[in-house]
Regions:
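N-terminal secretory signal peptides that target proteins for export/translocation
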Residues: 1-8
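Bacterial N-terminal signal peptides
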Residues: 11-22
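Boundary at the C-terminal end of the N-terminal hydrophobic targeting segment
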Residues: 24-28
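Extracellular/oxidizing-compartment recognition motifs
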Residues: 30-113, 117-423
Length: 423
């Protein structure tokens, strides 16, 4: 039994670890590190036409400081050389600025990614070595997103609250940089050939979807193989549901775009809406997702696929995905770090307070997921979990209307874990 602690981009401020650079001092007196665009490390999509760049410099001698910088930008990292940089060469610029320095190079939708590096001069005019390359993505324009329709689970085919959507991507040559853009109304997770893409959870971040929705960009180059590739998007309602004013459909929806870099140019890979299939996942929502009624998740273990591998997905019942006409929505790149699991906690105490009723004390208040393995139960047997941050009277927890239910499959190895809600 364990608890996943989540870092919420909308609630917590990340404390970044100090970077230890002392071992590098013997080789150079000026070490450039922590290159960022719009305060993000290598963002694959930004939501601005005027990006700003930042870097930090470690000096071996106290009192040294930057007196000038030079930035190179190019369409490929191999072009980050003076005379070759095809997007920008700032030349030597006299300035001590190293935070949110304006990018003044070429920036067009035809160049999905911009690679850049920087070097600096100290107060004595001594230059540093060039930094390691960084990159940022230009992203998808509002006009491009408006050309696509949302897809989701058909309204009358079953439970639409947490569906799987599946299609095939054909790849003729591996190794080409390939970016996947996902604009979901609700949460999403991405799987390619059975493997989860990235370590982010509860994506995208929270937004008021009647004003704007967010999209995430994934570098899926390393996940693709030559031939046919299985792409699965697992959706959850999150903040997009009928109990909230902008929930115009009873189920999450998604738009997807794919682009690949080949022979010096970016090409869009078409994924037609009619190629998508959808199935129930075994997960569904509980509660109203309103203050003091955020509920949780219901997991029907018998309906959850054993894995995201093709052999297990093929056992599900698939329907053609529904195309959904939606109100015109502003679509923006998510300009915050994603939610990730940052710690795993184990209970400090487990108390049986009645027949088949236990209190699990995690030892601290938390924001996160709950996970545990169950013994073999009878098919359809239900386990209910309720969550609170303190006891009310003795061993009675304070009711906060946060709860999950698990319906056993009757097989060995049943496991509960949250996916599209948290407590």
């Amino acid at each position: 039994m364990r608890l996943w602690s989540l870092m919420q981009s909308c609630r917590w401020v990340a404390i970044l670890p100090m970077l230890l650079l002392s071992s590098a001092y013997a080789q150079s007196e000026q070490i450039l590190y922590d290159l960022r665009c719009e305060n993000l490390v290598d963002p694959l999509s930004i939501d601005t036409h005027t990006p700003r760049l930042s870097w930090e410099t470690a000096y071996s001698d106290k009192g040294n400081h930057q007196s000038a910088y030079q930035i190179l930008a190019a369409t490929e990292p191999t072009l980050l050389k003076e005379g070759d940089a095809d997007l920008w060469n700032s030349e030597k610029t006299t300035s001590s600025e190293s935070v949110l320095v304006g990018y003044k190079g070429k920036l067009t939708p035809d160049n999905r990614l911009v690679y850049w590096c920087v070097r600096v001069w100290d107060q004595n005019g001594k230059p540093s070595a060039w930094s390691k390359p960084a990159r940022f993505g230009v992203g998808i324009s509002q006009k491009e997103w408006s050309e696509d329709d949302y897809i989701g689970f058909p309204a009358n085919a079953g439970n639409p609250q947490s569906p799987l959507l599946r299609t095939t991507i054909n790849v003729t040559e591996v190794g080409k940089t390939t970016l996947l853009y996902v604009n979901s109304l609700g949460y999403h997770e991405i799987y390619i050939n059975g493997q989860k893409v990235g370590n982010e959870v509860l994506a995208t971040a929270v937004s008021e979807m009647d004003k704007r929705s967010l999209y995430r960009t994934y570098d899926v180059t390393s996940y693709l193989t030559a031939g046919s590739n299985d792409l699965v998007i697992w959706l959850g309602q999150g903040w997009f549901r009928p109990t909230i004013r902008w929930g115009f459909y009873d189920g999450p929806l998604v738009k997807v775009r794919l682009a690949t870099y080949s022979d010096g140019k970016w090409e869009n890979i078409s994924i037609h809406n009619d190629s998508w299939q959808t199935a129930e996942s075994g997960y569904s929502s509980l509660g109203k997702w309103t203050p003091n009624r955020f509920g949780g998740e219901r997991i029907n273990a018998a309906a959850v696929p054993q894995s995201m591998q093709k052999k297990d997905l093929d056992l599900l019942t698939w329907y053609p995905a529904a195309t959904v006409q939606a109100p015109e929505l502003n679509v923006s790149a998510q300009m915050t770090e994603g939610n990730i699991i940052v710690d795993t906690l184990k209970p400090t105490n487990v108390i049986e307070i009645a027949d088949s009723v236990w209190v699990v004390d995690m030892g601290k208040a938390y924001t996160g997921w709950f996970e545990y393995k169950l013994p073999k139960l009878s098919p359809g047997q239900m386990v209910t979990m309720r969550y609170a941050d303190h006891f009310h009277h003795g061993t009675t927890i304070r009711e906060q209307m946060q709860f999950d239910t698990f319906v056993a499959s009757g097989n060995e190895g049943d496991r509960f874990i949250n996916k599209f809600n948290y407590h």
